[in-house]
Amino acid sequence: MELRGRNVLIVGFERTGEALCRFLLGRGARVRVSDKKPAEAFGTKLDDFAGRGVVFEMGGHRPESFLEADLIVPSPGVPPLAEIRAAREKGVPVLSEIELAYLFLRGRIVAITGSNGK
């Protein structure tokens, strides 16, 4: 999957959003982050990424951002939002972080699960 120049929307910045931002920026994507929490909840974490061109929409979600994206990557803790469903219905691809990572793996994959898939 070519990410260079593509508009990628990350939904939820909390735990894995930073790593995902770095990954996407390293592949030339134009990154936008949408999170329901206000910017103040993240302290200075946003500053470095904003300086690298990441656009932050904090304190709520703009439906337009979902429809304008070339790809949406919701964080694992994000519930199935109406904005994500609407974008998917319009043909915008929605991939989990794991699905996106899989597309860039070059080696063999071994999957091991425990009880009840944990």
Question: Where are the regions a protein language model picked out?
Answer:
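Walker A (P-loop) phosphate-binding motif
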Residues: 97-118
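N-terminal leader/targeting and accessory segments in enzymes
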Residues: 1-96, 100
